[in-house]
């Protein structure tokens, strides 16, 4: 090869390697955690896709409605470019959380179901939904895991720690937790809740400097048991409001102590978003914004966030979702699928 051609060839190779190097580093650092808050009309279906492409769905929405909620989950999975659900975590056995399991299992492959163990509630509808859920667990090759406080769910790319399950709670503080909780004094105990809500399987998800808390429908007294006298969690980046923002949950002992930067309320138009619970979240120390899946009819303008932060502003909605994208440095963005409004939150 002539000298001139060899020089051109060498320079070309250097240029190729330089371009590859320029794209390689951003590609590695640009991996993100994606969380889709799917509208299931006052139930829960939260799809998590880790930076390694692995998935966890928390709850499956309602049964019936011609498979409405299962279809919305499938569409979110398509948007996230995943073809199966590695894990499906059932927080508890109420219809708005476990009801959609059979319809979802007919539409998507599920690797492992996670729950808190057997149902202990006597209500007929709860027993029916639990029976239908168990039938799905018996399908081969679906796997099943019963989680207990202190367990870690083996979801690749993030750390998922179990805080509450089957009425029990974490006994030792996590990293960043353990401080005395002064907000316990403003959260008097209430009448005990014997329902499945109090048995909710709650988790803390950590992606390096980003932390996301989801306690399902955990109710007031169980929040106090978890959070008092010391806060075992520390602070979080994002808090999914407990129990859809109903006033049976969301004590200051929890909400104020975890000091969320952003709260996301998975309420329906006429389910959740109780004015008193909404106010506790809105006034929590350090809160920058609250986002809602629905405009809460009960709250009126005084107890709803601005429309830009609400995915569905009409009672008869189209199932618009909220999407969160988090980076390892703790920064994240939140996106409203209805109006494409996006807000970025810098690392702290």
Task: Enumerate the language-model features and the residues they cover.
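Bacterial N-terminal signal peptides
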Residues: 10-24
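Non-globular, low-confidence helical/coil segments that flank catalytic cores
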Residues: 2, 7, 22-348
């Amino acid at each position: 090869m002539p000298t001139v051609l060899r020089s051109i060839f060498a320079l070309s190779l250097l240029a190729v390697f330089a371009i590859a190097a320029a794209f390689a580093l951003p590609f590695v650092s640009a991996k993100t955690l994606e969380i889709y808050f799917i509208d299931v009309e006052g139930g829960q279906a939260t799809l998590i896709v880790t930076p390694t492409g692995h998935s966890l769905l928390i709850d499956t929405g309602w049964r019936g409605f011609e498979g409405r909620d299962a279809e919305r989950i499938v569409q979110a999975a398509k948007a996230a470019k995943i073809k199966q659900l590695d894990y499906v975590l059932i927080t508890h056995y109420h219809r708005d959380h476990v009801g959609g399991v059979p319809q979802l299992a007919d539409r998507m492959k599920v690797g492992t179901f996670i729950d808190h163990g057997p149902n202990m509630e006597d209500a007929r509808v709860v027993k029916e939904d639990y029976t239908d859920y168990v039938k799905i667990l018996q399908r081969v090759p679906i796997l099943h895991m019963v989680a207990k406080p202190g367990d870690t769910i083996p979801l690749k790319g993030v750390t998922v720690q179990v805080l509450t399950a089957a009425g029990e709670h974490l006994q030792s503080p996590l990293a960043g937790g353990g401080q005395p909780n002064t907000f316990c004094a403003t959260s008097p105990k209430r009448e005990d809740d014997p329902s499945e809500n109090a048995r909710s399987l709650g988790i803390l998800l950590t992606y390096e400097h980003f932390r996301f808390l989801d306690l399902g429908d955990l109710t007031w007294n169980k929040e106090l048991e978890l959070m008092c006298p010391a806060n075992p969690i520390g602070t979080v980046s994002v808090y999914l409001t407990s129990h859809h923002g109903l006033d049976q949950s969301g004590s200051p002992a929890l909400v104020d102590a975890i000091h969320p930067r952003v709260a996301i309320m998975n309420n329906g138009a006429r389910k959740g978003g109780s004015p008193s619970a909404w106010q506790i979240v809105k006034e929590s120390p350090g809160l920058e914004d609250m986002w809602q899946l629905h405009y809460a009819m009960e709250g009126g303008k005084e107890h709803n966030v601005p429309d830009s932060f609400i995915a569905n502003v009409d009672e008869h909605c189209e199932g618009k979702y909220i999407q969160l994208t988090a980076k390892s440095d703790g920064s994240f963005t939140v996106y409203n699928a209805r109006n494409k409004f996006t807000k970025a939150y810098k690392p702290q």
